Amino acid sequence: MGESEKISVGIIGASGYGGVQLVRLLQEHPLVDIVYLGGKGSAGQTYAEIYPHLGHAVDLTIEPIDTEAIASRCQVVFLGLPNGLACDIAPPLIAKGCKVLDLSADYRFKNLETYSSWYNKDRSDLDTAKTAVYGLPELYREEIKSASLIGCPGCYPTASLMALSPLLKQGLILPETTIIDAKSGTSGGGRQAKTHLLLAEAEGSFGAYGVAKHRHTPEIEQISSDLAGHEVKVQFTPHLIPMVRGILSTVYATLRDPGLVREDLLTIYSAFYRSSPFVKILPNGLYPQTKWACGTNLCYLGIETDPRTDRVIVLSAIDNLIKGQAGQAVQCLNIMMGWEETLGLPQLCFYP
């Protein structure tokens, strides 16, 4: 499709944090027209009632979820629903010719048994799931171009895989030594009321959760195994930090060649991501901060080696709601439609 014709887009699950980021980004996208916002509990409310700060720009009402009506009005549909719901909605939309981008975990896995064991939901949409492409453009750009269904990655996997991928693809590390230590702001937990996300609980505190059992673990392992060419298991531990948005993922692994130095790895990473406009490789001795990525679709990577332990340390900073969610979905849309990959996506952060 050329860059002169707007496409009609719908968003199901527009009332959550991922949904409002999609609305913000797509509202300013030059080749997109938002024609439908859908939801269950919020149906009947105007979008301005839910998010008053967008009332001057978005004159739409949340509508019931009706796949027949959606397919008749939308060429592309974004699904910003809780895990386990998209797999019931995506198949009929795709059957009617819509392109679908799912922000939940439903279409991230090649093996649905893995999904079912971690997300406690049996699946009957095997044929649809087989067509899904994992929506990490820096790794699967060519596959995304011809896809009709995108399983958009989770926020932690995005940050972690951006740091880890060159090491695995080039065979530079012993994969079984991989440790991922990641920290996220509270918006990663969604907009629903949860005790541990209350200001009184989160402020001034910092702790791990989902230790040895976080659902993003098998997602990271699936892509890591794909890159390495054999099964890879990683040690992944997420932490909640008292800020609204941002992820910092620190990846540790043992180098196969202890003689590799930071300058070697900077060259390797720069070559690996040479066609990736949102990846910023930091120079010697500079390490990323989450604020640098805030509000953008950028991923900052800092690299270090420790000759004392023969380990490589890679730090990755993203905005969990943009590159880790809505922005990456829009990036995939641009690729699917044959547009400039950066179209409508911010590259300048909110600062300070």
From Swiss-Prot:
InterPro entries xrefs: AGPR_AS, AGPR_type-1, NAD(P)-bd_dom_sf, NAGSA_dehydrogenase, Semialdehyde_DH_NAD-bd
GO biological process: L-arginine biosynthetic process
EC number: 1.2.1.38
Catalytic residues (UniProt): 155
Molecular function as annotated in GO: N-acetyl-gamma-glutamyl-phosphate reductase activity; NAD binding; NADP+ binding
Disulfide bonds: none
Gene Ontology CC terms: cytoplasm
Gene3D superfamilies: Dihydrodipicolinate Reductase, domain 2, NAD(P)-binding Rossmann-like Domain
Protein keywords: Amino-acid biosynthesis, Arginine biosynthesis, Cytoplasm, NADP, Oxidoreductase
Enzyme class: oxidoreductase
Enzymatic reactions: N-acetyl-L-glutamate 5-semialdehyde + phosphate + NADP(+) = N-acetyl-L-glutamyl 5-phosphate + NADPH + H(+)
Pathway noted in the entry: Amino-acid biosynthesis; L-arginine biosynthesis; N(2)-acetyl-L-ornithine from L-glutamate: step 3/4
Subcellular location: Cytoplasm
Taxonomy, superkingdom: Bacteria
PANTHER family in UniProt: N-ACETYL-GAMMA-GLUTAMYL-PHOSPHATE REDUCTASE, CHLOROPLASTIC-RELATED, N-ACETYL-GAMMA-GLUTAMYL-PHOSPHATE REDUCTASE, CHLOROPLASTIC-RELATED-RELATED
Family label: Belongs to the NAGSA dehydrogenase family. Type 1 subfamily.
Functional description taken from the UniProt entry: Catalyzes the NADPH-dependent reduction of N-acetyl-5-glutamyl phosphate to yield N-acetyl-L-glutamate 5-semialdehyde.
Name of the protein this chain belongs to: N-acetyl-gamma-glutamyl-phosphate reductase
Species the sequence originates in: Crocosphaera subtropica (strain ATCC 51142 / BH68) (Cyanothece sp. (strain ATCC 51142))
